[in-house]
Amino acid sequence: MSEINKDDIKQEVFDLYDDYAHDRIDRRTFVQKLSIYAVGTLTVTSLMSFLMPDYKGAIQIKADDPKLKSEYITYQSPKGGGTIKALLSIPVGTKKPLGGIVVVHENRGLNPHIEDIARRFALPGFITIAPDALTPLGGYPGNDDQGRELQSKRDKKEMLEDFIAGYDYLKTHKDCNGKVGVVGFCFGGSIANLMAEQVADLSASVPYYGGQPPIEDVPKIKAPLLLHYAELDTRVNEGWPAYETALKENKKEYTAYIYPKVNHGFNNDTTPRYDKAAADLAWQRTIDFFKQKLK
């Protein structure tokens, strides 16, 4: 990232990036509107460089980390996109079956950041699978703009089936103990909410700033929920009060946290929306939750 100070950037700039990252405005409009904030020493180029993901620089667990066995596999999703590619990660030296975690990507396919996240989740003692919903269209193209464009062409219900099929694959894996949870970010958070409603034997669900599921389906939820929201994420948070009311009325097991003064995407350490304090706290809560529910 550049040497721009995050605290010097107006909230409107982060909101503008959120609009762009979620396809509410195109790249041309994003650049045009961003120019309004290019004053003094700030240029559009420097702001763009500051806001865009730095995947290479943020990798924490490399693909060849000796503590993990990470490999690409394929599985079948007959109700979804057919053959789906995924990253499967297992701690080396595992002597007993482990709890499983399905890691669901954002709205741009299985990019390097989510692969890294999947490896991070495996290290504490889980077997993880991170499917790529873009597989039927050739897979993550190596560019987020193209990834978002490709993902917008897929049917969300079919993509949901792809992740449910990934759950089924993991649940019956020889190194899994049969207890499987799901964690998702942004689009993936909405999938985690939907899986809580549609997968009867799901052991745990952790949506990070994910859109809420249909309220009328809340009675179907059996999995315990741990929900992470960002205070400044007004778009996603708008649906939370009604969702929480339904969870309470139906006596569902859930814990929700709204992290103060942070943006949508606060866990993503490849962009300046990242907030280390909130991300670390949410991460530890998530690991503790999975350790409790997937043992």
Where are these regions (language model features)?
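Cap/lid segment of the alpha/beta-hydrolase catalytic domain
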Residues: R108, L134-K157, G265-T270
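Primarily recognizes the serine-hydrolase "nucleophile elbow" in alpha/beta-hydrolase
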Residues: I164-K222
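N-terminal secretory signal peptides
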Residues: M1-T29
